[in-house]
Curated annotation (Swiss-Prot):
Organism: Methylococcus capsulatus (strain ATCC 33009 / NCIMB 11132 / Bath)
Amino acids binding [2Fe-2S] cluster: 42, 47, 50, 82
Keyword terms of this UniProt record: 2Fe-2S, Electron transport, FAD, Flavoprotein, Iron, Iron-sulfur, Metal-binding, Monooxygenase, NADP, One-carbon metabolism, Oxidoreductase, Transport
Stretches assigned to the FAD-binding FR-type domain: 106-211
PROSITE patterns recorded: 2FE2S_FER_1, 2FE2S_FER_2, FAD_FR
Record-linked CDD domains: fer2 (cd00207), MMO_FAD_NAD_binding (cd06210)
Gene: mmoC
Function, as annotated: Responsible for the initial oxygenation of methane to methanol in methanotrophs. It also catalyzes the monohydroxylation of a variety of unactivated alkenes, alicyclic, aromatic and heterocyclic compounds. The component C is the iron-sulfur flavoprotein of sMMO.
Subunit text: The soluble methane monooxygenase (sMMO) consists of four components A/MMOH (composed of alpha/MmoX, beta/MmoY and gamma/MmoZ), B/MMOB (MmoB), C/MMOR (MmoC) and D/MMOD (MmoD).
Residue positions binding FAD: 221-235
Name of the molecule in the record: Methane monooxygenase component C
GO MF term list: 2 iron, 2 sulfur cluster binding; metal ion binding; methane monooxygenase [NAD(P)H] activity
């Protein structure tokens, strides 16, 4: 018999929220049904974005990737909320702060594919044009740093990506998407995506974005396609003619993976307070830019100055964790560090 259980979710900063979850639905689906947007992405147990600790209660855990949830983590009580079905009331410990949870109804719209451009060996620039709504409006609204869910045509498979451009009345959307060897959306981009196709788009979602702290310098650290929300935020600063000292540390593994360099140089030329450092972890002998990770470049700059910047991070968890450890060691308060983790996986 179907039962209804209470989920108590406690965030990293000690805030809590409660919602109901039926025994035949997973925790993420139940939260969404009640207009609570916990962090998630693939919703198929493959990417680990919704990983959390279940500290109390019994549940069924169904169909998780061992890469996303290794057996030793499962034994410790870690779960993927998109695959967690409650058998009793549950208490969940979320590994992020309350401000990263979105609430309320989220709109959706249709958008047409107008461009599909390979900009590096593993990255696609995916361009969409919002279709007019019932009033004829095309405009697309979001805060730079937020993300949207894109659904593969003819399926219910969706993935989350952040626009690299700014909100605009023309309804244009630009996404920078890493194409993996395996994965539903990666396969779609590689094999099936065509100009003229129509996708369902939900959003905006998320709370990653610029925080107002006066004239504090802003340092942005981006790993791979984590560059997209960073570029959107810096473009907003450009539009506002923000005078803050600004730096972008952009990292990839090899030179063929580099992308968006011309656009970054253009931003650097137009913003007198902006410095861009492109970093390659395994460079060739001809590479003349930064060698190593963007964390290495950030460390060098922090050690050579007395700056007390706000730090914005977007990229894989390992990069985020290393950056957070670095800034803590430099005495930068946690309230000056803002980040968006993403976890590329076979489910992406």
């Amino acid at each position: 018999m179907q039962r209804v259980h209470t989920i108590t979710a406690v965030t990293e900063d000690g805030e809590s929220l409660r919602f109901e979850c039926r025994s035949d639905e997973d925790v993420i689906t139940a939260a969404l049904r009640q207009n609570i947007f916990l962090m998630s992405s693939c919703r198929e147990g493959g990417c680990a974005t919704c990983k959390a600790l279940c500290s109390e209660g019994d549940y069924d855990l169904k169909g998780c990737s061992v890469q996303a949830l290794p057996p030793e983590e499962e034994e410790e009580g870690l779960v993927l909320l998109c695959r967690t079905y409650p058998k009793t009331d549950l208490e969940i410990e979320l590994p992020y702060t309350h401000c990263r949870i979105s609430f309320g109804e989220v709109g959706s719209f249709e958008a047409e594919v107008v461009g599909l451009n390979w900009v590096s060996s593993n990255t696609v620039q995916f361009l969409l044009q919002k279709r007019p709504d019932e009033c004829g409006n095309r405009g697309v609204k979001f805060e730079p740093g937020q993300f949207m869910d894109l659904t593969i045509p003819g399926t219910d498979v969706s993935r989350s990506y952040s626009p690299a451009n700014l909100p605009n009345p023309e309804g244009r959307l630009e996404f920078l998407i890493r194409v993996l060897p395996e994965g539903r959306f990666s396969d779609y981009l590689r094999n099936d995506a065509r100009v003229g196709q129509v996708l369902s788009v939900k959003g905006p979602l998320g709370v990653f974005g610029l925080k107002e702290r006066g004239m504090a310098p802003r340092y942005f650290v981006a790993g791979g396609t984590g560059l997209a929300p960073v570029v959107s935020m810096v473009r907003q600063m450009q539009e506002w003619t923000a005078p803050n000292e600004t730096r972008i540390y952009f990292g990839v593994n090899t030179e063929p993976e580099l992308f968006y360099i011309d656009e970054l140089k253009s931003l650097e030329r137009s913003m007198r307070n902006l410095t861009v450092k492109a970093c390659v972890w395994h460079p060739s002998g001809d590479w003349e830019g930064e060698q190593g990770s963007p964390i290495d470049a950030l460390r060098e700059d922090l050690e050579s100055s007395d700056a007390n910047p706000d730090i914005y991070l977007c990229g894989p968890p390992g990069m985020i964790d290393a950056a957070c450890e670095l800034v803590r060691s430099r005495g930068i308060p946690g309230e000056q560090v803002f980040f968006e983790k993403f976890l590329p996986s076979g489910a992406a």
